[in-house]
């Protein structure tokens, strides 16, 4: 069983801990792992960090921006979204958080090393391995939560 060898389950703080060499293995978001990699390089910590795509594939998530139908300042929301969609701005976000964006006009502003990172901009072969998370029925979600809670508790 793997659980006795797991020292902590956390979704916060692991970026800096990874960059500083305090963790040996992490299951996390590719953007977070690439941020840790860059921090290790910038901080000259000596840590070699690589995001990896499992050979069996993985989940593909998307961030979206929405405006509620009853938003009191919808015009401002549209202005903000239009600002984010400016190629230079969209590219600066990709360069900072290491997530691809769908804005083709932004690609020319993405740093070369970021644009060539295949855990950020997936190859066609890797794209075929990825899938959206399944929408699970409520009873399955309850079982999933119970099992994960038990695992975290060390049982």
Model-derived regions, located:
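Solvent-exposed loop/turn segments at secondary-structure junctions
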Residues: 30-34, 56-59, 71-72, 88
């Amino acid at each position: 069983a793997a659980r006795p060898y797991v020292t902590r389950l956390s979704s916060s703080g692991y970026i800096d801990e990874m960059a500083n060499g305090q963790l040996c293995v992490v299951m996390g978001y590719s953007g977070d792992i690439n941020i840790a990699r860059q921090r290790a390089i910038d901080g000259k910590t000596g840590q070699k960090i690589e995001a990896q795509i499992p050979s069996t594939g993985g989940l593909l998530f998307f961030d979206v921006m929405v405006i509620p139908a009853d938003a009191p300042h919808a015009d401002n929301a549209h202005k903000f979204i239009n600002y984010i969609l400016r190629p230079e701005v969209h590219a600066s976000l990709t360069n900072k958080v290491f997530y691809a964006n769908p804005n083709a006009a932004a690609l020319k502003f993405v740093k070369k090393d970021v644009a060539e990172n295949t855990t950020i901009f997936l190859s066609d072969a890797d794209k075929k391995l990825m899938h959206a998370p399944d929408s699970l029925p409520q009873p399955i979600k309850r079982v999933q939560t119970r099992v994960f809670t038990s695992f975290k508790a060390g049982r």
